[in-house]
Amino acid sequence: MSKDIRVLLYYKYVPIENAKEYAAEHLAFCKSIGLKGRILIADEGINGTVSGDYETTQKYMDYVHANPLFSDLWFKIDEENEQAFKKMFVRYKKEIVHLGLEDNDFDNDIDPLVTTGAYLSPKEFKEALLDEDTVVLDTRNDYEYDLGHFRGAIRPDIRNFRELPQWVRDNKEKFMDKRVVVYCTGGVRCEKFSGWMVREGYKDVGQLHGGIATYGKDPEVRGELWDGKMYVFDERIAVDVNHVNPVVVGKDWFDGTPCERYVNCGNPFCNRRILTSEENEHKYVRGCSAECRAHERNRYISENGLTRQEWAERLEAIGETLTPANA
């Protein structure tokens, strides 16, 4: 079956004058050609993922490259059977990547155009993975790591990327004197984070140029030493990386069986991303905890039209009960 849709992943750090106005112009153009996706535009640059048919995505790439600021912008292209997005969003933000540092932190202003880690090609990164003296650090959110990661990479004890700088500071004595290489989905987070590590005093910091997305497409490494799938922030959720010897590393939240299917916890005040089968999603009413399963706002209940009696019976089947307030 031919794949008629292209998904474009890209970013570029470059100063953009009147970025807020440019974001509005950018959105108008994207809508005029029927493009779908999500784009962030800030004073420091642009970061986006978009999808459309061949003609639409080609028009978009030509439009972007026609701007002198983005004439050399690197598009990473996936071919798919279906659209990766349902709508088109272009938003102006203060930053395209937020490190989560305090406003008074002297390292708060990280400019990757001035300070960033050394770029590693996929081949060089693979060599780093095999080097016992090199620390490989995953800079993504916890749920991204759980779906797939490089073999031997460290999973920081964090929930999201914004917590990573503090985690690195808390563990500085473990890594300061070692070579550290970092990676993320497409490279945009690592550009800034590796620069922050250099500012923190790390002497030997590297980053996977182009991110996991590029590593999986490299004709020489072919994604080897990647385990699981790569989490992406669109309708696809998970994409293949390892084309040599792929394995499943994701585990069902409820029973630990191999799983690569993500859902959000039904409790809107939790919304945690969890891996689970369709069977367990229904069994546990899409709640990641007893509290979430019995929460009065659990979206699974309304989405599936469960009566309170049916809801209570589901919970009783797993040894739980609705709270008195919800009974």
UniProtKB/Swiss-Prot annotation:
Active-site positions on this chain: C184 (cysteine persulfide intermediate)
SUPFAM superfamilies: Rhodanese/Cell cycle control phosphatase
Keyword Oxidoreductase: yes
EC number annotated for this UniProt entry: 1.14.-.-
Alphabetical UniProt keywords: Oxidoreductase, tRNA processing
Pfam families according to UniProt: Rhodanese, Rhodanese_C, UPF0176_N
Source domain of life: Bacteria
GO molecular-function term, one example from the UniProt record: oxidoreductase activity, acting on paired donors, with incorporation or reduction of molecular oxygen
Record carries keyword DNA-binding: no
Listed InterPro entries: Rhodanese-like_dom (IPR001763), Rhodanese-like_dom_sf (IPR036873), Rhodanese_C (IPR022111), TrhO (IPR020936), TRHO_N (IPR040503)
Residue ranges of domain Rhodanese in the record: 130-224
Top enzyme category: oxidoreductase
Alphabetical GO biological process terms: tRNA modification
Catalysed transformations (reactions): uridine(34) in tRNA + AH2 + O2 = 5-hydroxyuridine(34) in tRNA + A + H2O
PANTHER family: RHODANESE-LIKE DOMAIN-CONTAINING PROTEIN 7-RELATED, THIOSULFATE SULFURTRANSFERASE/RHODANESE-LIKE DOMAIN-CONTAINING PROTEIN 2
HAMAP family cross-referenced by the UniProt entry: TrhO
Protein role: Catalyzes oxygen-dependent 5-hydroxyuridine (ho5U) modification at position 34 in tRNAs.
Family note: Belongs to the TrhO family.
Listed name of the protein: tRNA uridine(34) hydroxylase
Organism: Streptococcus suis (strain 05ZYH33)
